[in-house]
């Protein structure tokens, strides 16, 4: 007797999330929602009325759909809910308040310093006071890994000693009386990239002092993406190669991370290298070398989980086309799944506040996810 109500409640919530997930991407009429979700028009209309009543969606001006007919699109209300966001980076931290449309309403940035956690909490409290707190869904936290995301704990990311062992989710949740969700920065970036709507089957690759990757398949983070994020840099590309800090030899990170690439060269940064690539044979050689090593690690993943797009993030976003041309050539020649034209390579979002927006998307993903 207790099973039926639980199943009915689950089905109702599932259908509601299905409608909301569609509306998050774009405005749609009730008829379009019914076709997109597979729900009946009656069920879709009932859900729409509930969402309108709850103030989560709104009606837009009617639009002509031909033959003298019109339809009234529905859209998510930007001010229906909010998310607080914390983006932890190695040299800085940013805190923000975002609405349901992904607009960054408030923003604070702090350099790495003593007492940083107290500054973060104070900034979050001030932002929370500026809106109806009952509409704040939670706090999204983006951080380099390795992390214990389920436990909300930052483990031991390199060059991140200040945060080692900090149970950040519990601390912020207790301080703000809100749920807090910790996520790998690369996975958070992938969630944000998904919401930009260009692809639902992609790999996002982050290259700086380390290498991380997250994979989206059909709009879902692949189950082991959180594993890939921390470990792709430690896949072996040369069994007798360089010693890695992890204890193994020949890890991708020892060849394709930016510090490894620049070691022994005349360049101090990827930007300097890229700016010299048109005139400097050394720079040209290093760009090709980066593509060669990076592709060796990525092809292993692509052969298991094909995607149509690769997004480059981190330092290599700058003048990305230099690297993309060589990467595409290597992948085309060595991957199992297709030709040069079968995969697109782009830079990830270049919004200067992308880290903060991505942390907010961790919260919104929890709300919208079916």
Regions found by a protein language model. Give the residues of each.
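ATP-binding/phosphotransfer module of carbohydrate and carboxylate kinases, centering on a glycine-rich
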Residues: 1-62, 66-135, 197-198, 251-370
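Short glycine-aspartate micro-motif
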Residues: 83-87, 136-140, 202-206, 212-214
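Short, acidic, Ser/Thr-enriched surface-loop or helix-capping motifs
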Residues: 99, 149, 216
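Glycine-rich phosphate-binding loop and adjoining helix at the ATP-binding site
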Residues: 104-201, 322-333
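Glycine/GP-enriched mid-protein hinge/lid loop-to-helix segment characteristic of carbohydrate kinases
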Residues: 107-109, 163-164, 170-281
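Short, active-site-adjacent cap segments at secondary-structure transitions
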Residues: 146-149, 187-190, 212-213, 222, ...
């Amino acid at each position: 007797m207790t099973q039926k109500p639980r199943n009915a409640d689950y089905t109702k919530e599932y259908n509601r999330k299905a409608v909301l997930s569609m509306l998050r991407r774009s405005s749609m009429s009730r008829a379009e929602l019914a076709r997109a979700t597979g729900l009946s028009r009656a069920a879709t209309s009932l859900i729409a009325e509930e969402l309108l009543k709850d103030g989560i969606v709104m009606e837009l001006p009617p639009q002509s759909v031909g033959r003298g007919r019109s339809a009234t699109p529905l859209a998510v209300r930007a001010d229906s809910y909010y998310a607080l966001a914390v983006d932890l980076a190695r040299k800085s931290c940013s805190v923000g308040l975002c609405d349901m449309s992904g607009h960054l309403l408030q923003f604070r940035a702090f350099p790495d310093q003593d007492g940083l956690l107290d500054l973060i909490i104070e900034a979050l409290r001030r932002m929370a006071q500026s809106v109806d707190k009952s509409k704040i869904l939670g706090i999204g936290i983006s951080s380099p890994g390795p992390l214990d995301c389920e436990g909300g704990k930052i483990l031991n990311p390199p060059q991140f000693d200040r945060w080692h062992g900090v149970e950040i989710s519990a601390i912020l949740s207790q301080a703000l009386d809100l749920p807090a969700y910790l996520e790998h920065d690369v996975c958070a970036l992938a969630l944000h990239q998904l919401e930009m709507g260009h692809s639902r089957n992609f790999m996002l690759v982050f290259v700086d002092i380390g290498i991380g990757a997250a994979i989206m398949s059909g709009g879902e983070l692949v189950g082991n993406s959180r594993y890939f994020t921390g470990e792709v840099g430690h896949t072996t590309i040369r069994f007798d190669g360089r010693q890695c800090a992890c204890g193994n030899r020949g890890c991708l990170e020892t060849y394709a991370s930016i510090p490894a690439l620049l070691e022994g060269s005349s360049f101090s940064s990827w930007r300097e290298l890229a700016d010299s690539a048109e005139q400097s044979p050394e720079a040209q050689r290093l760009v090709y070398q980066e593509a060669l090593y990076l592709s060796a690690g990525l092809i292993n993943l692509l052969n298991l989980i094909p995607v149509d797009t690769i997004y480059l993030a981190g330092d290599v976003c700058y003048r990305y086309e230099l690297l993309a041309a060589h990467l595409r050539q290597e992948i085309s020649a060595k991957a199992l799944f297709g030709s040069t034209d079968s995969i697109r390579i782009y830079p990830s979002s270049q919004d200067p506040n992308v880290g903060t927006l991505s942390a907010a998307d961790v919260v919104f993903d929890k709300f919208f996810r079916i």
